[in-house]
Amino acid sequence: MAIVDEAKLGYLDFLSREDRVRHHRYVEEMKQYDMMRSGDINAISESAKLWDSGLYGQLSDDPLKNAKYRFVTTITLATRFAIEGGMDEEDAYNASDLYIQDLDNCKTPEDVRRLHTCLLYTSD
């Protein structure tokens, strides 16, 4: 099992300070999910803003994998908040499964971005 390498963690922190970049803030992320949970249509623009902000970690050196990993984290959390907001559990998990299966067909980061947009505009 991998353990977080303190030296690597320190180096990433150094690079973030030097480049004056940061991850988006937890409160920014939670605002988006709270809006999703309550069914607020403005969650769409909030999620799109976060996706396009560039304020996210680098999960992979490969841009396509990076976008796919980000999408999986988004759909995973969105599924939980949709359930908390009253969506049927099985429907939420099935929708998540289908989106992740669709993700397999994405060939470019822009394909992933389009799928993310489809996710945001899905309604019952």
What are these regions (language model features)?
Residues E6, Y11-C106:
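DNA-contacting interfaces and partner/effector-binding or oligomerization modules
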Residues M1-A2:
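Extended, non-transmembrane interaction/recognition domains
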